[in-house]
Each structure stands twice: as structure tokens, then as C-alpha cells.
């Protein structure tokens, strides 16, 4: 999406905040239903990032597959699990949680500083060659094939890893 700079930056911050808050909700909510809805918020924010990055096909695939199918499946699986009783004396924040919070926060800030200091940060990846190639292709399926095998290969690989982790988590929950 070709937006003016300030609007683009505002949307990035807004969707990034939704992504971070949704991720914290997945981790911190003790109710699995609330965690599943927070996961839905995370997946929607990721698809909105793809829309901002001019990847409408990847965004629609993200919405249809992950939010529309996988997240709904997780919510139904959690709802059909025989009533887990939560301990009333459950301490919400333990020493291990604090250590994990400190380590994860440190890793987060390390990644942010690494990304900002990388020489490839801020490069516009769309080139004139890609635009000329898109004009030469006959139909949309050829364009989608070229983009999936070149430009959007890393996002789809990351999406497949997320799907694998979600399936392993669903199997672990189902076995309990």
C-alpha cells in the first residue's frame, strides 16, 4: 500500500502495538480461550503488516488459513477439552516467570538493535525489474507463482514453521 510517510509509520506502530499486546495476551492469560483470541489478534496484525508491505495475496492467505481455519480450530479444541479446573491458589508471577521476562526482554532489545544496525535495513525491495516482469506475464496465476517462489518465499516458510508449532501445541494439549 503506497501511503504517505507519517500515515505509514503510524500504521506500523499501531499494528506493531496490537501484535505485541496480542502476544503478551497469549502468554499471560491463564484462560486458554482468551489466549486463543489473543492469538487471533496477533495473526490479524501480521496480515495487516503484509497489506502495508504490498503483499495482499499473502495477507489474504494469512487471514483465510490462519485466522479463519487454524485459530478457529484451536478455539474449538480448547472449548471442547473437558473442564480443566484452575488452581485457586495459583501464583500469577513466580521467580521463573521473572527470569524468563528478563531474558526475553534482553533478547528483544538485542534483536531490535541488530536490525537497526544492519546495512539492509530500510531498503525498498521492489525494483524496476520486478515491475517490468509483472507486466510481461500473461495472467495473475503466473504473477502469483513468480512472487511465491521469489519475493514471498521467506514469509511462507515462516508461516509453515508457525503452523508446525501450532499443530504440535494442539497435539500436546489434546494428549493431556
UniProtKB/Swiss-Prot annotation:
Enzyme Commission (EC) number: 7.1.1.-
Class of enzymatic activity (EC top level): translocase
Pfam hit, one: Oxidored_q3
Catalytic activity, reaction form: a plastoquinone + NADH + (n+1) H(+)(in) = a plastoquinol + NAD(+) + n H(+)(out); a plastoquinone + NADPH + (n+1) H(+)(in) = a plastoquinol + NADP(+) + n H(+)(out)
Compartment(s): Plastid, Chloroplast thylakoid membrane
GO cellular component: chloroplast thylakoid membrane
Superkingdom classification of source: Eukaryota
Sequence intervals crossing the membrane: 10-30, 33-53, 61-81, 92-112, 152-172
Membrane topology of the entry: Multi-pass membrane protein
Membership in a protein family: Belongs to the complex I subunit 6 family.
Quaternary assembly: NDH is composed of at least 16 different subunits, 5 of which are encoded in the nucleus.
PANTHER family given in the database record: NAD(P)H-QUINONE OXIDOREDUCTASE SUBUNIT 6, CHLOROPLASTIC
Function: NDH shuttles electrons from NAD(P)H:plastoquinone, via FMN and iron-sulfur (Fe-S) centers, to quinones in the photosynthetic chain and possibly in a chloroplast respiratory chain. The immediate electron acceptor for the enzyme in this species is believed to be plastoquinone. Couples the redox reaction to proton translocation, and thus conserves the redox energy in a proton gradient.
Protein name: NAD(P)H-quinone oxidoreductase subunit 6, chloroplastic
Primary gene name: ndhG
